[in-house]
UniProtKB/Swiss-Prot annotation:
<dbReference type="GO" id="GO:0005819">
    <property type="term" value="C:spindle"/>
</dbReference>
<feature type="region of interest" description="Disordered">
    <location>
        <begin position="730"/>
        <end position="752"/>
    </location>
</feature>
<feature type="modified residue" description="Phosphoserine">
    <location>
        <position position="395"/>
    </location>
</feature>
<keyword id="KW-0131">Cell cycle</keyword>
<dbReference type="Pfam" id="PF09309">
    <property type="entry name" value="FCP1_C"/>
</dbReference>
<feature type="modified residue" description="Phosphoserine">
    <location>
        <position position="674"/>
    </location>
</feature>
<feature type="modified residue" description="Phosphoserine">
    <location>
        <position position="872"/>
    </location>
</feature>
<keyword id="KW-0132">Cell division</keyword>
<keyword id="KW-0378">Hydrolase</keyword>
<dbReference type="InterPro" id="IPR015388">
    <property type="entry name" value="FCP1_C"/>
</dbReference>
<feature type="domain" description="BRCT">
    <location>
        <begin position="629"/>
        <end position="728"/>
    </location>
</feature>
<keyword id="KW-0539">Nucleus</keyword>
<feature type="compositionally biased region" description="Acidic residues">
    <location>
        <begin position="937"/>
        <end position="947"/>
    </location>
</feature>
<dbReference type="GO" id="GO:0005737">
    <property type="term" value="C:cytoplasm"/>
</dbReference>
<dbReference type="InterPro" id="IPR011947">
    <property type="entry name" value="FCP1_euk"/>
</dbReference>
<dbReference type="InterPro" id="IPR004274">
    <property type="entry name" value="FCP1_dom"/>
</dbReference>
<dbReference type="GO" id="GO:0005654">
    <property type="term" value="C:nucleoplasm"/>
</dbReference>
């Protein structure tokens, strides 16, 4: 908007400033010789108003009017006195005539003080006075009279104008818009046209992603343009005057605007950022300043409704989420995104089946192996070193069906004639700024990659223009290939949910009908498609400036790069080292948003023409047109909800009720099954199957049972979509998106069950029904009873599979870095075969015993183990003596020799200070023979003293565990 130039007379009707009277100075009368100002002239501080001389010298002027000095020069007898202004203002009245003698203190001129209607950084544009440095005689700063309180220029909040001049400029803007038959569109950036993240982008070479820094030392930001963004802006700019309004910083807003509009043809200076916001929590505070005459011609598109306080002229946009785990980076303070940064699930469209299984890249994009990306941004790595320049992709291929043709007629918000006449949205909106590895920006090599290349400022415009025609033939092939890769319907047929477009919280896009996209529909075209892949990607370097690649645009990009802290080849050369992968971002919401805005524009000027013809008395207002068009979407629908919110919560406060009412639907609370009842429902929106309402509604043929995605799809398209595309399935609650607008979950999430708990919490073991066999001399546990697998020692349920503690054929993973012995079907001879369990300090650190208690218990265990070691030594020496004196009793000798093995093992473990309970393993033959021997000689080796010792040892070990 134009700003009044300095020196302009204040607008008529402005408040009258204080009028000051300038009086004749000095004690003696003065004669006025001449005026240096005229009535209506603007004066500044120090300007000469008049020239005087003393009145006494005027009486004797006839005799001695002048005298000759010694040098021969003539000078006046009395010096002239100049009257200077002490304040700035406008001369309203001259109270004396030249030649008149003015008495001391008489009024000479009446001066109206400057109202400072235009102020720039504290300086008045009318009088030039510095309003920040006015000092009064007592040293306190004066408060000057200034009427400049309105900031009308987006990016210059320091430029203030008076409210009267603001209204005058506002009326001029409205007249200009009416002459051009345009409206005003306030455009949000984050998650509306772009998606930005600070997270490391592993696929740095993904097409359509810009990598930049806002300053030295700042984190690298990665911005993805929404598909069809450039095409959307270029078409809407013909109907609307675009204004950018974002909660991002000023540098961020201008950098993103440079990506979207490098030639400054779409937004110009109309960029409003967080630094210019009056209210950091709301965007409505600046509307009064930007549009002093009201926002009756202003339409708003934003993904957030709260920041606009649910304004009636707001069109809610489906959130655009490309980077997983990142929401709105510039969300207002106190919002959910700024506090929790919750991960947003983003459903992406599925690809056409390929011979090899699809691969999921870290960005969450399903990609077909072996297919190079060709979405109109840049060439594959093998072609980027060539000399071909960027080529536009704005010309649609003749005969190629429009993307909107794949949707059912009931979903299209416009007529078939409008769809046929509308140009096809191109993929040129998804663009990326990168530099070929073999090129340096400072060398001026031919064919620098992109129209908007952050690292290039020496693009050759001549070669760029020369190669446009040569690559235009391959544009249609690349577009046709992407058209064939549209998502296919699910096997359920008409019951498939929408997956073809990116899903916004709670408002999914409906998929194509089953009959229109069969899995093998384009099978014959697969080989030509892959064969012409290289040719289809040769045009990949799509420009951001309407397909115009010239030097001026490259210079603009270079300036934006320097402003944002990205130097030539600093961060983008290395991004091309990785192999390009296909981008399958199938978000097409901007296509439907464009149709909605066209409908609003058409309806406004249809009413405006009627207003000019005196057919209607009231001028059209966007704030009434948007709700009126929106309320016609579901005007003949009666909705009843089931399972979307708690029963004790008022339904009027839910988002489903708010948006359904805005779409014109009638909300019912009681299900009426009679088809002839006047208050019967036509649609039942349920969150889960199996409820009483759902079972009753499914028996009625006139009632549509759909899931909540049907409502959000109607909202994002402003059209009643097909109910068959959104059936209610049993697993809908499980597959429900986390970013759904539904504010209340239907059920508490069940914690996931781990297949193997890394640190199971095992309380003190309880005596089980199994039989334990102990050694008669050492008191060690030899084995448990052969009544089946050993039961877990814990009686409390542990959140893991039962098989995680049992012996299974695959090797068990190591716990705490120790080797686990091989389990042998329940044969675990003693502590040497027992798995190490986590200690109390590892599982329950707050209940750990103190150091003194542990030392005391260790001492007791060492004493017990020492006694057992002495007994085992004596038992070991006994068979050695028996070998010297042969005896006929062989079973006894065999038994004693067998018992020597665990004793020596225990002695070596105690002497070497190894881990307690970590013993040498026995072979299967020893275990089998020992089991059979102990079963036959069990009664012979039992003693009361050994039993007491074994019980004491087991109790101590259980306490330690």
């Amino acid at each position: 908007m134009e700003v009044p130039a300095a020196g302009r007379v204040p607008a008529e009707g402005a408040p009258t400033a204080a009028v000051a009277e300038v009086r004749c100075p000095g004690p003696a009368p003065l004669r006025l010789l001449e005026w240096r100002v005229a009535a209506g002239a603007a004066v500044r501080i120090g300007s000469v108003l008049a020239v005087f001389e003393a009145a006494a010298s005027a009486q004797s002027s006839g005799a001695s009017q002048s005298r000759v000095a010694s040098g021969g020069c003539v000078r006046p007898a009395r010096p002239e006195r100049r009257l200077r202004s002490e304040r700035a203002g406008v001369v309203r009245e001259l109270c004396a005539q030249p030649g008149q003698v003015v008495a001391p203190g008489a009024v000479l001129v009446r001066l109206e003080g400057c109202s400072h209607p235009v102020v720039m950084k504290g300086l008045c544009a009318e009088c030039g006075q510095d309003l920040t440095q006015l000092q009064s005689k007592n040293g306190k700063q004066q408060v000057p009279l200034s009427t400049a309180t309105v900031s009308m220029v987006h990016s210059v909040p320091e430029l203030m104008v008076s409210s009267e001049q603001a209204e005058q400029l506002g009326r001029e803007d409205q007249q200009r818009l009416h002459r051009n038959r345009k409206l005003v569109l306030m455009v949000d950036l984050d998650q509306t046209l772009i998606h930005t993240t600070e997270q490391h982008c592993q696929q740095m070479s993904n097409k359509g992603i810009f990598h930049f820094q806002l300053g030295r030392g700042e984190p690298m930001l990665h911005t993805r343009l929404r598909p069809h963004c450039k095409d959307f802006l270029e078409k809407i700019a013909k109907l609307y005057e675009l204004h950018v309004f974002t909660f991002g910083s000023r540098l961020y807003a201008h950098t993103i605007a440079g990506f979207l509009d490098p030639e400054k043809k779409l937004f110009s200076h109309r960029i409003l950022s967080r630094d210019e916001c009056i209210d950091p929590f709301s965007k409505t505070g600046n509307l009064r300043n930007l549009f002093p005459c009201g926002d009756s011609m202003v339409c708003i598109i934003d993904d957030r409704e709260d920041v606009w306080k649910f304004a009636p002229n707001l069109i809610t946009v489906k959130k655009y989420v490309y980077f997983q785990g990142t929401g709105d980076m510039n969300a207002p303070p106190g919002s959910r995104e700024s506090q929790t940064r919750k991960k947003v699930n983003h459903s992406r469209g599925t690809e056409v089946s390929e011979p090899s299984p699809p691969v999921r890249d870290p960005e969450g994009v399903t990609q077909a192996p072996g297919v190079e990306p060709s979405n109109g941004l840049e060439k594959p790595a093998r072609e980027l070193n060539g000399s071909e320049a960027a080529t536009p992709r704005d010309s649609p291929r003749p005969g190629k069906p429009d993307e909107r043709d794949i949707w059912p007629p009931a979903q299209a918000p416009t007529s078939s004639q409008e769809l046929a006449g509308a140009p096809e949205p191109q993929g040129s909106c998804a663009q990326g700024g990168r530099v070929a590895p073999g090129q340096r920006p400072a060398q001026g090599a031919t064919g620098t990659d992109l129209d908007f290349d952050l690292s290039s400022d020496s693009e050759s415009s001549s070669e760029s223009e020369g190669t446009k025609s040569s690559s235009s033939a391959s544009d249609g092939e690349s577009e046709g290939k992407r058209g064939r890769q549209k998502p296919k319907a699910a096997p359920e047929g008409a019951g498939a949910l929408a997956q073809g477009s990116s899903l916004e919280p709670g408002r999914p896009a409906a998929p194509s009908l089953p009959g229109e996209a069969e899995p093998g529909a384009h099978a014959p075209d697969k080989e030509p498609e892959l064969g012409g892949q290289e040719e289809g990607e040769r045009d990949g370097l799509c420009g951001l400036g309407n397909g115009c690649a010239d030097r001026k645009e490259a210079e603009t990009e270079s300036q934006n790069s320097e402003l944002s802290g990205v130097t030539a080849g600093e961060s983008l050369d290395q991004s091309m080292e990785e192999e390009e992968e296909e981008d399958t971002d199938e978000d097409d919401h901007l296509i439907y948003l464009e149709e909605i805005l066209v409908r609003v524009h058409t309806d406004y000027y249809a009413k405006y023409d009627r207003y000019l013809n005196k057919e209607i008395e009231e001028a059209p207002d966007i704030r009434k047109i948007v709700p009126e068009l929106k309320s016609k979407v579901l005007a003949d629908v009666a909705i009843i909800f089931s399972g979307l919110h708690p029963t004790n919560f008022p339904i009027e406060k839910t988002r489903e009720h708010y948006h359904a009412t805005a779409l014109g639907a009638k909300i019912l609370t009681r299900l009426v099954l009679s088809p002839d009842a006047p208050d019967r429902a036509t649609h039942l929106i349920a969150a889960r199957a199996g409820t009483e309402k759902v079972l009753q509604a499914q028996e009625c043929g006139h009632l549509h049972v759909v899931n909540p995605d049907w409502l959000w799809s109607c909202l994002e398209r402003w059209d009643k979509v097909e109910e068959q595309l959104f059936p209610l399935r049993d697993d809908h609650t499980k597959a429900q998106r986390e970013n759904s607008p539904a504010a209340f979950p239907d059920r508490e999430g069940v914690p996931p069950t781990a297949l193997f708990h890394p640190m199971p919490v095992l309380p003190k073991a309880q005596p089980g029904p199994e039989v334990r066999i102990y050694d008669s001399n050492t008191g060690k546990l030899i084995r448990t009873g052969a009544r089946g697998p050993p039961a877990p020692s814990s009686s409390l349920p542990i959140r893991q599979e039962p098989s995680s503690f049992r012996a299974v054929p695959p090797p068990q993973p190591q716990m705490f870095g120790e080797e686990l012995p091989d389990a042998q079907d329940g044969e675990q001879p003693g502590p040497s075969r027992r798995k190490r369990q986590p200690s109390m300090s590892e599982t329950m650190p707050l209940y750990t015993l103190c150091k003194e208690d542990l030392e005391s218990m260790d001492k007791e265990v060492d004493d017990i183990l020492g006694e057992g070691s002495d007994d085992s030594d004596s038992e070991k020496r006994r068979p050695e003596e028996q070998e010297e004196e042969p005896q006929p009793r062989k079973p006894g000798t065999r038994r004693e020799r067998t018992l020597g093995a665990p004793a020596s093992s225990e002695r070596s473990a105690a002497g070497g200070r190894g881990p307690r309970g970590h013993k040498r393993k026995l072979n299967e033959e020893d275990a089998a023979s020992e089991s059979s021997r102990e079963s036959s000689n069990e009664d012979e080796g039992s003693s009361s003293e050994a039993d007491e010792m074994a019980k004491a040892l087991e109790a101590e070990l259980n306490d330690l565990m």
